[in-house]
From Swiss-Prot:
The keyword Membrane applies. GO terms for biological process: cell adhesion; homophilic cell adhesion via plasma membrane adhesion molecules; nervous system development. Disulfide bonds: none annotated. GO terms for cellular component: plasma membrane. The chain crosses the membrane at residues 691-711. InterPro entries: Cadherin-like_dom, Cadherin-like_sf, Cadherin_C, Cadherin_CS, Cadherin_N, Protocadherin/Cadherin-CA. It is found in: Cell membrane. Residues 35-133, 138-242, 247-347, 352-451, 456-561, 568-671 form the Cadherin domain. This is Protocadherin beta-3.
């Protein structure tokens, strides 16, 4: 049952009955105040702060305001003093008409928390109006045969004041024939009747003139007068008589104009002109004459303007039937106006709380009242809003409602709500009114900036100029205003050895990244760091993204020749036997490039040669080979210039210089060696002979094997000492130079040679070939394995 009651309170449609709804939002009872009408603007009614038990500052802090029906500003509330003051002169007659007492209902609306205080102000009447007759002159025709005691109706006066200030009685100037009586209608209005005291004599006095005075009960009293002119007529035996002394008729307020609502009828027993009857309104007010029209012949009473139940719900109309002799009869028509549903409901907005923070819970967004001028079911009202909105209507006090949010809102999903409040009455047909309220949702910093990518990869070519824009990061924030303003920063690198602050910087406003210095691919190929994005909300929210910077290689390094050495010392000389076949490997140029990729792809070509066409260079690996058979006519010494070029743009290059010496054979030394060299060679030869002799005479296989191994080990040790050459600095024709393999040739082509120049004989000698039968077998294998060997060379 409790859950059902909760659902009932949160229903979107609430039936409003114009009755007082007591609750926690309202005061326990209405406070009543009074003030006399016509008081000047600013007149003090009461001190609300004192009456409500609040401090003046609290009254202002809670946004106290006065709410009146129809949103009329009759009052003003001073937040400085807490006084309730008149905002304008109040005219009781204008506000309430004849209704007494005259009560103005108003509410004091307090917020934080929401509270209604119901109040009422009674407007006390002052005697500011005099009685007024509808006709300043009345003309009566009375037969001289009229009997004393006959009552003759007179036109009444009206006084807009009420109570004792209203019209109280009538008087007439003293005379011997008439006196006046004061009568009261059912609605309390007073009217006069003229009573004949003494028979009239036309021959003695054919006309009389009297003054009728209307007096109110004010202090001092006010009065109004009308002149009565009486004409004494000859005898007319019968006066007209109505079929009914009272007609009652109910008329719908939407009855069309010129509709006949009632027909009165009178008869006269006389004949001739004395029996001819005409009908007329008897001392009717201006409002009656504007609303109805009476046919003087037929007695049909028609509407001449639309009725309005909400303004006047009944009329009392006096009708006079007069014959040709001046005699008359009187009847009364009471018109009851029947309410129809012709007024749509009205909404009066008291306050709107907009914008509201998106993280606020159940919050009062608006306070409004509804009303309908109709009565009964026509004035009962039902309120509703759309079902798909996070709001509901909550009835408070009397005819007031509050529009309340169901909970926290999400500005990023929807920042503005146009709420249509539909008010429908229960009449037939039902009338409805729609009222739109716009509620704005203000932003709360509940969204952190979000990068467009979780990681960014940037490419920067080395040797860039400092302050170069290398890329950008971007983050967006779904919030608005300052909560969505993003600033960027570099976060401390995870690698403590990375000098990030000297490598890159970031523009805090737009996320542009800049290189602070020229980058060197050979020193730093790549690095990564984190970038933070922080909004300006309170508290600030942030996020981060990873940035990888890849340095692209530029062709900024020339090839470097490792072999042959180009250090300006003794040049390297390669020996080539004259018996070498075409394609014989002379040497190999070895070079490296500090760049990477295609910038480090090297190609070789023979740039210059002493004898063109004799040697060629393999373009891809730098091998220098013979291009044809050698002959005795070929010079013994050759100088080659090999160009090493990379594949960069633009390409870079280096030049290697080779010296080649053609020799007849390797069996005899070409040049004399130092004295120590022959002795070493002979000792080595004797050792070999000794090993062979011992091996041949050995009778035991095991002993021979062991001895052979020992001799071989001894041979290798001595061969190492014999192979060393002294390499002094200086030009080629000088001391011995070591031109043993530098590691750039394959093991098959490694050898050692010692050369000397000067006064010795022009001979050379191979001290020790590392691999026996090198020349014959190596050249033969090259020629047989690759018949198109020559095609892979580049000749110059």
């Amino acid at each position: 049952m409790e859950a059902g009651g909760e659902r009932f309170l949160r229903q979107r449609q609430v039936l409003l009955l114009f009755v007082f709804l007591g609750g926690s939002l309202a005061g326990s009872e209405s406070r009543r105040y009074s003030v006399a009408e016509e008081k000047e603007r600013g007149f003090l009614i009461a001190n609300l702060a004192k009456d409500l038990g609040l401090r003046v500052e609290e009254l202002a802090a809670r946004g106290a305001q006065v709410v009146s029906k129809g949103n009329k500003q009759h009052f003003q509330l001073s937040h400085q003093t807490g006084d309730l003051l008149l905002n304008e002169k109040l005219d009781r007659e204008e506000l309430c008409g004849p209704t007494e007492p005259c009560i103005l209902h108003f509410q004091i609306l307090l917020q934080n928390p929401l509270q209604f205080v119901t109040n009422e102000l009674r407007i006390i009447d002052v005697n500011d109006h005099s009685p007024v007759f509808f006709e300043n002159e009345m003309h009566l025709k009375i037969l001289e045969s009229t009997l004393p005691g006959t009552v003759i109706p007179l036109g009444n006066a009206e006084d807009l004041d009420v109570g004792r200030n209203s019209l109280q009685n009538y008087t007439i100037t003293p005379n011997s024939h008439f006196h006046v009586l004061t009568r009261s209608r059912r609605d309390g209005r007073k009217y006069p009747e003229l009573v004949l005291d003494k028979a009239l004599d036309r021959e003695e006095q054919p006309e009389l003139s009297l003054t009728l005075t209307a007096l109110d009960g004010g202090s001092p009293p006010r009065s109004g007068t009308a002149q009565i002119n009486i004409q004494v007529l000859d005898i007319n035996d019968n006066a007209p008589e109505f079929a009914q002394p009272l007609y009652e008729v109910a008329v719908l307020e939407n009855t069309p104009v010129y509709s006949v609502i009632v027909t009165v009828s009178a008869s006269d027993l006389d004949t001739g002109s004395f029996g001819t009857i005409s009908y007329a309104f008897f001392h009717a007010s201006e409002e009656i004459r504007k609303t109805f029209q009476l046919n003087p012949i037929t007695g049909d009473m028609q509407l001449v303007k639309y009725l309005n139940f909400e303004a006047i719900n009944s009329y009392e109309v006096d009708i006079e039937a007069k014959d040709g002799g001046g005699l008359s009869g009187k009847s009364t028509v009471i018109v009851q106006v029947v309410d129809v549903n012709d007024n749509p409901p009205e909404l009066t907005l008291s306050s709107v709380n907009s914008p509201i923070p998106e993280n606020s819970g159940e919050t009062v967004l608006a306070v409004f009242s509804v009303s309908d001028l109709d009565s009964g079911d026509n004035g009962r009202v039902m309120c509703s809003i759309e079902n798909n909105l996070p709001f509901f209507l909550k009835p408070s006090v009397e005819n007031f409602y509050t529009l309340v949010s169901e909970g926290a809102l999400d500005r990023e999903t929807r920042s503005e709500y146009n709420i249509t409040i539909t008010i429908t009455d229960l009449g037939t047909p039902r009338l409805k009114t729609k009222y739109n309220i716009t509620v704005l949702v203000s932003d709360v910093n509940d969204n952190a900036p979000a990068f467009t990518q979780t990681s960014y990869t940037l490419f920067v070519r080395e040797n860039n100029s400092p302050a170069l824009h290398i890329g950008s990061v971007s983050a967006t924030d779904r919030d608005s205003g300052t909560n969505a303003q993003v600033t960027y920063s570099l976060l401390p690198p995870q690698d403590p050895h990375l000098p990030l602050s000297s490598l890159v910087s970031i523009n805090a406003d737009n996320g542009h990244l800049f290189a602070l210095r020229s980058l060197d691919y050979e020193a730093l190929q790549a690095f990564e760091f984190r970038v933070g994005a922080t909004d300006r909300g309170s508290p600030a929210l942030s996020s981060e993204a990873l940035v990888r910077v890849l340095v692209l290689d530029a062709n900024d390094n020339s090839p470097f020749v490792l072999y042959p050495l180009q250090n300006g010392s003794a040049p390297c000389t390669e020996l080539v036997p004259r018996a070498a076949e075409p394609g014989y490997l002379v040497t190999k140029v070895v070079a490296v490039d500090g760049d990477s990729g295609q910038n480090a792809w090297l190609s070789y070509q023979l740039l210059k040669a002493t004898e063109p066409g004799l040697f060629g260079v393999w373009a891809h690996n730098g091998e220098v080979r013979t291009a044809r058979l050698l002959s005795e006519r070929d010079a013994a010494k050759h100088k080659l210039a090999v160009l090493v070029k990379d594949n960069g743009e633009p390409p870079r290059s280096a030049t290697a210089t080779l010296h080649v010496l053609l020799v007849d054979g390797f069996s005899q030394p070409y040049l004399p060696l130092p004295e120590a060299a022959p002795a070493q060679a002979q000792a080595d030869l004797l050792t070999v002979y000794l090993v062979v002799a011992l091996a041949s005479v050995s009778s035991l296989f095991l002993f021979s094997v062991l001895l052979f191994v020992a001799v071989r080990l001894c041979r290798r040790s001595r061969a190492a000492s014999v192979g060393r050459c002294s390499v002094p600095e200086g030009p080629f024709p000088g001391h011995l130079v070591d031109v043993s393999g530098t590691g750039t040739l394959s093991q098959s082509y490694q050898y050692e040679v010692c050369l000397t120049g000067g006064s010795g004989t022009n001979e050379f000698k191979f001290l020790k070939p590392i691999i026996p039968n090198f020349v014959a077998q190596g050249a033969e294998r090259v020629s047989e394995a690759n018949p198109s060997f020559r095609k892979s060379f580049e000749f110059s």
